[in-house]
């Protein structure tokens, strides 16, 4: 990946570094052949970081920074780039802790932008979400599209605060001249999710790894764009280095647009299990994303030169499951 050479000699902060996307981004940086780059991997749980990154414990390029994004960042490092990938994407958290979700998404961006502004940061990459689009009208989502979000629903804590955080990036760009770019990943899958992660793909994989049939709590008719995490982080690199300041870019694999039901059947087939239906309880319903169709255009991202890596979704899901087992 020739683009990564542009980071030679740079210092980067990656928040959410023990999460799915953040940790894969750290891997990409540190596994690049002899790349002279300094990476500060920020997260709240040092033990989780030790488990996730054992191969870097003696690597002088790697530093773990214990940090909660809801607080101002207190350190003396001048980061060339900040990649803000910290956000709780668990539907269970949306249902039970909507206040914390909103404050973390908005204040996290503010705290990091304030730090970057005070320390001559070169560029800020905000990892937002495709949930900013809300409920659409059936069209493919381009970056200038915005659908309906019920602002009086507590479940809207996530898309509404992601929208607000994006606007905050734009405001800092306008008022303070800061260089910000935004990524909007589609539903992203890959290994290294936690036992408490209740996103659908993680639930389905845990089912088959335990030798269980996959339990669906809905009809599974919701239609989604998906992206393998390695493809997602390669897209983040293009956005970081080639994206236009102030712009947002969708991330998705356009060969991986399937329904939740089709996803369940794919994972069940890989694990030689069945899919069974079960009614959800009220708490589970409260965390559901009500959007029925969420398909992304990636034309803007591809114009930067990015392409999805070879392999279909089933082969990448097999790789995910084998790395989880």
Predicted regions and their residues:
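Active-site Tyr-X1-5-Lys
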Residues: 135, 153-181, 209-210
């Amino acid at each position: 990946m020739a683009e990564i050479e542009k980071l030679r000699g740079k210092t980067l902060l990656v928040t959410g570094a023990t999460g799915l996307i953040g940790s894969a981004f750290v891997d990409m940086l540190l596994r690049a052949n002899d790349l002279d780059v300094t990476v500060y991997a920020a997260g709240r749980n040092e033990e989780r970081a030790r488990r996730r990154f054992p191969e870097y414990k003696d690597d002088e390029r790697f530093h773990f920074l214990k940090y909660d994004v809801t607080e101002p960042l207190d350190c003396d490092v001048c980061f060339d780039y900040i990649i803000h990938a910290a956000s709780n994407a668990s539907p269970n958290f949306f249902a039970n802790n909507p206040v914390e979700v909103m404050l973390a998404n908005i204040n996290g961006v503010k705290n990091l932008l304030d730090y970057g502004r005070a320390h001559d940061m070169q560029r800020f990459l905000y990892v937002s979400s495709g949930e900013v689009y809300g409920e659409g009208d059936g069209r493919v989502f381009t970056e200038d599209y915005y659908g309906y979000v019920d602002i009086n629903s507590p479940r809207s804590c996530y898309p509404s605060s992601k929208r607000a955080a994006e606007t905050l990036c734009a405001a800092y760009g306008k008022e303070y001249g800061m260089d910000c770019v935004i990524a909007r990943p589609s539903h992203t899958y890959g290994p290294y999710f936690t036992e408490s992660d209740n996103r659908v793909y993680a639930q389905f994989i845990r089912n088959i790894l335990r030798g269980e049939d996959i339990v669906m709590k809905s009809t599974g008719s919701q239609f989604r764009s998906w992206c393998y995490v390695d493809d997602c982080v390669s897209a983040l690199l293009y956005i970081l280095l080639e994206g236009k300041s102030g712009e947002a870019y969708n991330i998705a694999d356009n060969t991986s647009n399937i329904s939740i039901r089709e996803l369940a059947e794919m994972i069940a087939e890989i694990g030689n299990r069945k899919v069974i239906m079960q009614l959800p309880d009220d708490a589970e319903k409260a965390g559901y994303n009500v959007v029925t169709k969420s398909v992304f255009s990636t034309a803007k991202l591809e114009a930067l030169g990015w392409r999805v890596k070879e392999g279909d979704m089933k082969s990448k899901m097999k790789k995910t499951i084998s790395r989880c087992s």
